[in-house]
């Protein structure tokens, strides 16, 4: 098949993927900058940010999954050239997101102290105090990051990834500048980091909602106050979003459960694991950008009735993602020691971090891509329940149980987390590869 016969040319793919990859890297850097700047305040601060962010990511991933469910509908309607239904889908995504995010924020603010104590148990008192402060401000940002996720997903479903990228660039400037002023200038510690993040997320939400009003795109959303619930469309969005939301939430709940075991190892181990999580995220985030772009590509291909194209692009972009993972792992490995020194980590925490990153650099390029990238394409085809079931089983069986066993019964340190992770990745990769080659995922009808 020649390139001109494909729905997406290589140039179109570059235009789609480069901004979304760049955006994902920038979003990841926001959390990295928070942690590195706070790390100079002390181990208690970096531990607090790490612990609370594990809750924040759980909530934000659930919002992202709901937004992605709507984006699947939008992209398939765009592929069909049915812009009216794409617009209706977009309006309902925004309605669902704002309703749920406001409710979640209210619950988190009301119960933040017992929630933190329930999840993290007997952490050191200074860590718990800093965690309560950080969680208060970041919980306030949930509706804003949720609205941004919804708006950005709607833009990506149309193939417009440059707009969200531009917003992310400015948002990161706001976050970094706010961190510098509030953490170092006003000595506000974790509160300063959280307030800077809140400000950047408010900016993101306002700008993306304003951009959705423009006439230059297939999907245009105005009169936000006049959006009313459409039961049928909401059910369709939720049918795609809830399984992905459960999958993402179970994934993050597993991380929280694992974090409870890691928290028993002491502040040095918590700090080492926190920095390792950040660095591991950095060496995979660009490839995740490819996966997010793949959802748009597969959705539009299937909306246009081109199943052969969907298969072709999953293969093609999986190869691209693997190249990115290899390069990213090598880069992060080289930068690990300088980053731990720049972050002011204690020597023992830095040593443990480097040991874990060394193993990640070896294992991740072998198994990670097949475990995650094809799944984005399968979800865009509507195969969300299979992805949810597979991910939940492998995560709880291998990642969680193995990790807890190694820490609590075999005396392992934080490396146990990554042994469980590697096992999970390997099994996921095998299962999703078999599912992809079976072609059963192509039998779903989304629109």
How would you label these PLM feature ranges?
Residues 46-106, 145-164, 270-336, 368-392:
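Small-residue-rich hydrophobic transmembrane alpha-helices
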Residues 25, 29-47, 116-125, 181-188, ...:
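Helix-terminus/linker motif at the lipid-water interface of multi-pass membrane proteins
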Residues 24-28, 61, 101, 105, ...:
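Residue-level hotspots within the lipid-embedded alpha helices of multi-pass solute transporters
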Residues 4-36, 40-41, 57-69, 73, ...:
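N-terminal transmembrane alpha-helices
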Residues 15-34, 137, 171, 200-204, ...:
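Transmembrane helical elements of multi-pass membrane transporters/channels
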Residues 67, 137-156, 164-172, 193-208, ...:
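Short runs within selected transmembrane alpha-helices of multi-pass transporters and secretion channels
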Residues 43-54, 131, 135, 194, ...:
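Small-residue hotspots at the loop-to-helix junctions and early N-terminal turns
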Residues 1-20, 74-141, 185-242, 298-364, ...:
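Short alpha-helical transmembrane segments in multi-pass integral membrane proteins
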